[in-house]
Amino acid sequence: MRTIVIMVTFMFCINVIINSQNVMKHELVKLPYAADALNPVISKQTIEFHHGKHLQGYVNNLNNLIQGTKFESANLELIVKESDGAIFNNAGQILNHNLYFLQFSPSGGGKPSGRLAQAIDAGWGSFENFQKEFEAGGMGVFGSGWVWLASDNAGKLSIVREGPAGNPVTKGLKPLLTFDVWEHAYYLDFQNRRADHLNSLWKIVDWKIVESRYNN
């Protein structure tokens, strides 16, 4: 009898291990730059709170929420496309922030080149016109949200405004560039000056990253 109990316990433990390996555990994205590298556009303090606290909280929440659901082994983009409620909100925030933080570089700035530059010129006439429209899109988000540069399957670009956790993937579009207009993204550095926050972000955009998203 004791042998049977031991064997049952052993098999249960094996199943737990196997099942746990099949569950996708989402992790906090690692930044490719130091916390103070984007200063003064984004301060070290903002990075530490925005990335280390806010984003970590979304990651923790999502990992807890998807346990026992059909999303527990799904990738982030699929979760955002197919979920709703709390799961969507946390997954959307993770996907958005991952794209946001990874598009920056302390040596960023300048202008895009190649196919992306051509597509921007085709859509807005010039890069400068695009910048103005993009910043206006960010200013037009009421409350918390995001402004995106996105492309369709044909490569045509559009500026998309989204709410708190919204992402263009839910519209069948490819997200290329995003500016976060949640207050926690800029209040420590710019207080209520959202326009200054938006305008300053161009200085740290890594266009090689944005171009790679467009070309892939």
What annotation goes with each model-predicted range?
Residues 1-22:
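Bacterial Sec-dependent N-terminal signal peptides
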Residues 21-216:
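Feature for soluble, non-membrane regions of globular proteins
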